[in-house]
Design a protein with these regions (language model features):
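N-terminal Rossmann-like dinucleotide-binding module
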Residues: 1-64
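Short glycine-rich anion-binding loops that position phosphate/pyrophosphate groups of nucleotides
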Residues: 16, 94-95, 145
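Short active-site oxyanion
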Residues: 42-46, 86-88, 188
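Beta-loop-alpha module in the N-terminal Rossmann-like domain of NAD(P)-dependent dehydrogenases
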Residues: 67-131
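A contiguous active-site-proximal alpha/beta segment in oxidoreductase catalytic domains
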Residues: 79, 119-182
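Rossmann-like dinucleotide-binding domain that binds NAD(P)(H)
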Residues: 177-196
Length: 196
């Protein structure tokens, strides 16, 4: 059996990158940091964030869990200092997905894991797809809830019920539903949570 560990970096130590791992109401692991630390095949070697206070907290936490915990203030700085990356996880605010994902792709890891939504619009998503194709780097969009026990239960019900004719759903995520002006930063529920 191979004992290779995949050298992994995390871009963004905010809500989905780190903080949701402490939410006791969520099925865990609920953040990229916690999932990466839990996986024995992952070597979480570095992270970056523009919030330097949170970055220090992240560093202390991951070091206490056996990670090297190198930290950088930007993706550019990280990629200049970390070589031969296997996996780059992009978990930044939606408004930075295009820039950070392209930067990750151009660093040529073996895989980029991009937090959903892919981008703020289809034009930005296409730029990411084009860059990935050009650099021959696969980009996987994170939809972890499909593995959630509640989603698995819903799938079992759907198999029993048969072909779905209609679905009605309500979502209360605390985010705004949608307005044109929210497209600039992606902070609306339809884009952020609607993909689930």
């Amino acid at each position: 059996m191979e004992n290779k560990k995949y050298k992994t970096v995390l871009i963004g130590t905010g809500r989905i990158g780190f903080l949701l791992g402490f939410d006791k109401k969520r099925e865990q692991p609920a953040s990229h940091t916690m999932a990466l630390l839990k996986n024995k095949k992952i070597e979480l070697c570095a992270g970056c964030d523009t919030d330097l206070e949170r970055l220090k907290i992240w560093q202390k936490y991951v070091k206490s869990h056996g990670s090297e915990g190198l930290v950088f203030e930007s993706g550019s700085e990280l990629y200049k200092n970390i070589e031969k990356i296997d996996i780059a996880v992009v978990a930044v605010n939606e408004s930075a997905h295009l820039e950070e994902c392209i930067r990750a792709i151009e660093a040529r890891p073996r895989l980029v894991i991009l937090e959903k939504p892919v981008a703020l619009n289809s034009f930005e998503a296409q730029k990411i797809a084009d860059c990935a194709e050009k650099n021959k780097v696969p980009v996987m969009v994170n939809h972890e809830r499909r593995f959630d026990k509640n989603y698995a239960l819903a799938m079992q019900w759907m198999e029993k019920i048969g072909e779905i004719q209609r679905v009605e759903a309500e979502l209360d995520s605390g985010l705004r539903i949608y307005a044109k002006e929210f497209e600039k930063d992606g902070t609306y529920s339809l884009l952020h949570d609607g993909t689930h």
